[in-house]
Amino acid sequence: MIKGLAITVVAVLAVVQLLARPSDAAVSCGQVDTSLTPCLTYLTKGGTPSTQCCSGVRSLKSMTGTKADRQAACNCLKQAAARYQGIKDAAAAALSQKCGVQLSVPISRKTDCS
C-alpha cells in the first residue's frame, strides 16, 4: 500500500515538474512582425515613431529575455529588412532610442545574430 502511494506521489511530482518547466520555444518571426508593423511608416519615411510603434518596440523587448529569443528576433528583423526594401538603416538603428527603450536586439541588416 505505501509502496503504491510513493510511486503515485513520485509520478505526480514528475508531471508537475514537466508542466512547470518554461518553454524552450524562441520568439517567432510572426511575433516580431506583429510588434513592429506599426513602425513601417517611421522606418521608411523617418520622423518620429508613433505611440503604437513604440508600444511594439516595448513588446519586442519583453519577448527577448533569453539569448535564444534575442537571436531569433535578430534573425527575424534581418529577414523583415530584406522583405521591405524601403527601410532606412539610420531610422532602424535609432528606433529604440527614439522610443526610449533599451533593446537588447539591434535593428540592423548587418547585425551578426550569433
From Swiss-Prot:
Protein name: Non-specific lipid-transfer protein 1
Lineage: Eukaryota, Viridiplantae, Streptophyta, Embryophyta, Tracheophyta
Organism: Actinidia chinensis var. chinensis (Chinese soft-hair kiwi)
Presence of the UniProt keyword Glycosyltransferase in the record: no
Signal sequence range: 1-25
Entry coiled-coil feature ranges: none
Disulfide bond entries: C29-C76, C39-C53, C54-C99, C74-C113
GO biological process, one term: lipid transport
Entries under SMART domains matching the protein: AAI
Family to which this protein belongs: Belongs to the plant LTP family.
Known role: Plant non-specific lipid-transfer proteins transfer phospholipids as well as galactolipids across membranes. May play a role in wax or cutin deposition in the cell walls of expanding epidermal cells and certain secretory tissues.
Keyword Signal annotated: yes
Record key words, sorted: Allergen, Disulfide bond, Lipid-binding, Signal, Transport
Superkingdom as given in the UniProt entry: Eukaryota
Tissues of expression: Expressed in seeds and, at very low levels, in pulp of fruit (at protein level).
InterPro entries tied to this protein: Bifun_inhib/LTP/seed_sf (IPR036312), Bifunc_inhib/LTP/seed_store (IPR016140), Plant_nsLTP (IPR000528)
GO molecular function, one term: lipid binding
